[in-house]
A protein has these predicted regions:
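N-terminal catalytic or cofactor-binding beta/alpha core of small enzyme domains
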Residues: 1-108, 115-139
């Protein structure tokens, strides 16, 4: 994979959550990499009530800012490096599975080629992973 620096965030979050939630009931963590659409069969087979996508998305905010979005608040042109735009993936998932699809996005500093997360995005990683793990472990989530 030819990763672009901050675009590694989604995979890094998925890896952290897999470590933090190895046996959490009702939770599956899938690392979609640069083609999350390839995991739609796995997601459909699990039949979740919610799908949470984790990604670095240029949404015009301060780098490192975390935001929640649903399909209606994501523009087709919002910059990501995935083969299928996130809006279309979100629409497909919510149309093929009776579930709520949510994006937890982080504003990247850069999506240029690189091997490391930028400082503001890296600073967000551990606290966001901890918050998500705690939320997903909570009863009545």
């Amino acid at each position: 994979m030819d990763w672009k620096s901050d675009d590694r965030l989604g995979c890094a979050l998925a890896q952290a959550l897999a470590r933090l939630l190895p046996d959490a009931p009702g939770v599956r963590v899938a690392n979609g990499g640069e083609a999350p659409e390839n995991f739609t069969g796995t997601v459909r087979a699990f039949a979740p009530s919610h799908v949470v996508l984790l990604d670095a998305v240029d949404h015009g905010r301060e780098p490192g800012t975390v935001f929640l979005a649903d399909e209606r608040s994501i523009a087709v042109g919002d910059m990501t490096s995935h083969h299928l735009p996130l809006k279309l993936l979100m629409r497909y998932l919510s149309g093929s599975i009776p579930c709520r699809v949510i994006l937890v996005g982080v504003q990247p500093l850069t999506l240029r080629p690189g091997k490391r997360l930028s400082a503001p995005v890296k600073k967000t990683l551990a606290p966001l992973a901890g918050f998500l793990a705690q939320t997903l472990r909570s009863p009545g989530r």
